[in-house]
Swiss-Prot record:
The species this protein was found in: Corynebacterium kroppenstedtii (strain DSM 44385 / JCM 11950 / CIP 105744 / CCUG 35717)
Cytoplasm among keywords: yes
Designated name of the protein: Peptide chain release factor 1
Keywords, ordered alphabetically: Cytoplasm, Methylation, Protein biosynthesis
Known role: Peptide chain release factor 1 directs the termination of translation in response to the peptide chain termination codons UAG and UAA.
Amino acid sequence: MATHVSAVDDIVSEYQGLEAQLADPDLHNDAARARKVGKRFSELQPIIQTNDRLNAVTDDLEAAEEMAHEDQEFAAEAERLREEKEELSDKLADLLAPRDPHDGDDIVMEVKSGAGGEEAALFAGELVRMYQRYADKHGFAIDVLDDAPTDLGGIKDITMSIRSKKPSRDGAWSVFKFEGGVHRVQRVPVTESQGRIQTSAAGVLVYPEPDEIEDVEIDDKDIRVDVYRSSGKGGQGVNTTDSAVRITHLPTGLIVTCQKERSQIQNKARAMQVLAARLQQMKEEEAEAAASADRAAQVRTMDRSERIRTYNFPENRISDHRINYKAHNLDQVLDGDLDDLFSALQSAERAERLEAE
């Protein structure tokens, strides 16, 4: 408990400092710094609010216990306050527990169809719609940076930016990070005339997005920028100039494309953001692997080459193989109802982090 008190005191001091900065008009002349301060303020706010409520309940409980000897109504009130105090103490401990430093971050997500041809592309499209529906329900905004649709409405590959609509302690990374890996589907494809169940797959890659490109060192001589004409199905939204951008990072071979913005400058800026996110992720994973070479699995990330989840349509079943999670509500999950699954994954990650401390 003493450790919690010390930690909260430090957070209260930091929170008050951030509050003073946000009240300073000069801060808002520097948009990047203002975003960072606002983001950190939002991350600390739930801790401050929970701690304030816990202190108030503790004071009320002491008063109620003193009066309980004379009035039975206060005895009942004291019992209620004891329960609330215990709940708040548990909540505060959870808020103070070790957490992923990127949990408040926006993300870049890539979804790619795997083995299975057109059926795999259709499944990749369903995964994208599942994420879009979840995002709509939970205050996230999705921007498509680049995509390659198929004739039947599937997706060969797509790159998206997923952002919180307002600063939050729990950003897009806090939930979508669990999606990195191979997703397998079992069902009768629409193209299958014999009614046989087939298996196909789609791969998902997720990267936390740096607050600023400048946070990641990218040397101009290490990149090659190519421009080309944007593709599309026609209409006013299609660019008629060479505005699409492809950036190749020469040392790593990473290639990033963006064609959804209205100008070449905007497409290059967004492509650089995606490249920065991918390079940051590579650097962190290399450092983490070196620091935890004696462990079979990393704490923060799952192996992106492994099969993490199976979507079984005949049984309406979804299975997450990392935590032995099974549920027969696949139809609801594909409609964006991922709350139970994400909650189970977050609990497992939290337990693993506490064990590693």
